[in-house]
Amino acid sequence: MSHCFVKRLSLCICTALLVASCAKQNKQAFYNTGIIYCSESNPVTFNPQLDTSSTTSDASSHQLYDRLLDFDPESGRIVPSLASSWLVSDDGLTYAFQLRKDVWFHNTRYFTPTRNFNADDVIFSIDRWRLRSHPYHYVSGGRYPYFESIGLAQNIASVERVNGYRVEITLKRRDSSFLANLATDFAVILSEEYANQLAQTGTPGKIDELPVGTGPFKFDSYRKDHFIKFLRHDNYWRDQMEDAPTSDEALSYNNTVESANQEVENGQGGEDTVQDGTAQNGDETRPVVEQLIFDITPRSSLRLAKLMTGECDATAFPAQTELEVIRAKEDLTLAEKPGLNIGFWAFNTQRPPFDNPDVRRALAAAIDKNTLLEAVYFDSATRAKTLLPAASWAFQNDADDTAYNPVLARKLLADAGVKAGFSMTIWAMPVERSYNPNATKMAELIQRYLRDVGVEATIVSYDWTTFRRHLQEGLHDSVLIGWSADNGDPDNFYRPLLSCGAIPSGTNRAMWCSEDYDKLLNDALQTDDIEERTAIYRQVNRLLYERLPLVPIAHAYRYQAYRNELEGMTINPFGGVRFGGVKKAL
């Protein structure tokens, strides 16, 4: 062996060792300063105005953006965010928002902001979804499902710039849920300056593909079916906030918030309804990690395996069958909380014979909901009588509920002219959700129940994007799906799921429209009195029981599994995972 060869071999070995050492150091550096989250699917978009799925919200609203208002993660109360305070007129129609100063948008490889966030960004963001004449309204399809489903655009008379840091929004009629809707995942604030830059280059669609926000993380890269990479937003405005207030200041502030939130909950609040957010961090806190990776892993069992081996720090939607495994692992944490959600079986009421309430009643009587809960949820859910869970202030414990009665089911079907052997489809969503962790299994159980009453059911499923598109097209006979609340107002369940306006937006899976129902919902938003609203919602529950466009099945607990090294993880009351303020204990 020549001396020259030995030298070259030694050099190669040293180089390999150096590379391995650097790689190990880089991996350790990322482990110390980065978080990997095992996500279940691809986001539909990086603009949550355009999509209502929790996958999209997790990858966009919760990490990239801020809103005018937020929800406190513990109490669910409305707290300031980009709006530091607000005033409400005596007639309840005009809302004046004071905006924070020194808030910067993300500085990325594709956009460098030249100014701070201001009133122009608020007006641009709201007018995009509310005005069809807006130059960005039809970009990326021109559908804004959440806002369409609640009819908010039709109720806003104007959005006006008072000055650079003050905006006034005037409504056409009172809406006791208005502030709560501004705090939802979908009411994000975009950069008008970035939009203008894209318009000048003829690429407006990039605003939803290469996002820019003010949130705790900024977008870096995305590879479909593989990963999303976020970087820390170094100029995040919450990092610039002053230290926490003194105890006297905190007491004064908390009293103001307590009073104002009570007025908001009661639909009240005149010129003296003021909230000052200078000492409040809301639901997003300071990011203390340099990188955030979403590892897109559709299979729940694989997500759990990655969590257990440390390849992921947290995981989405652990399966009910995995909960005991997670609880038994000393290095893992399983947080849980009753969910503000509803899992249901919806009938396409625009397709015969499902347009007949008696047929819908027959199908509801054919299934045993208790068995579905035991087999699919494993004691991690409660039986649903109405759309509202027990945590809602309008919950009705004595509401009417469907009962398992196959004899009645056969009679109703026969009386409606539905002959034995009638066939239908049950669409089962292909993703796991807290409100229905295994739609396919539930569909199989319902399929057996229906066979007992002479109905042959075929189970249909597609990939998530195709599934949602075909639902929007109304190709289903029935579907197993659900809803997680975006805010604590009862209207957030009733209106998006079953109002006439929610059909074109795609959130009304029953495609059911009732003028009586819509009138009751509108009446409920006109009153300031909680007892009056509750009484109206009792009428709503009775109407839904009589006409049964869908069968409420379960209100599920929400779970979040993560490694013990993570600190600051919380379960948001309205769903989703947020990594602002989460850090790793080294």
How would you name each of these model-derived features?
Residues K229-R238, E242, E258-T278, A328, ...:
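Append "and occasionally in soluble cytosolic enzymes with long acidic Gly/Pro-rich linkers
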Residues L412, Q560-L586:
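Long beta-strand-rich cores associated with HINT superfamily self-processing modules
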